[in-house]
């Protein structure tokens, strides 16, 4: 199982919208969110709000067999939830998930687990 943590800056003034977006996925749109992630091959996704002096960031942790496939699938999907999700990400983060990310995916340097 592969994992990834990635940070997305939240555009100025969009933090409350990001919180509402997250609440939508945890609440009224949870079944659509879950179906989307299962369809994309994810097994876990956690989003954190990180407040910094430079601005707020969403830090997303995910697990899947094929992380690049998750991004590719999400970028191409025409499922209504995935289209809505991409629109929210573009509006809140300024990131167009229909296009390749503007750089390589983050590289893990340490991975400690209790045994």
Enumerate the language-model features and the residues they cover.
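N-terminal low-complexity, charged segments
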Residues: 20-43, 47-50
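Long, hydrophobic N-terminal alpha-helical segment
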Residues: 1-30
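Local beta-strand/beta-hairpin segments that build beta-sheet-rich folds
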Residues: 98-115
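Short, well-ordered beta-strand segments in beta-rich or mixed alpha/beta enzyme
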Residues: 5-9, 18, 45-76
């Amino acid at each position: 199982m592969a994992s990834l943590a990635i940070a997305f800056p939240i555009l100025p003034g969009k933090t409350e919208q990001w919180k509402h977006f997250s609440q939508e996925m945890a609440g009224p749109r949870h079944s659509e969110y879950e179906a989307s992630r299962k369809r994309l091959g994810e097994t876990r996704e956690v989003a954190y709000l990180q407040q910094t002096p430079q601005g707020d960031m969403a830090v997303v942790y995910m697990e899947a067999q094929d992380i690049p496939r998750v991004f590719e699938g999400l970028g191409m999907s025409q499922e209504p939830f995935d289209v809505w999700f991409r629109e929210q990400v573009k509006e809140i983060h300024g990131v167009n998930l229909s296009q390749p990310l503007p750089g390589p995916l983050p590289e893990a340097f340490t991975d400690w687990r209790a045994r």
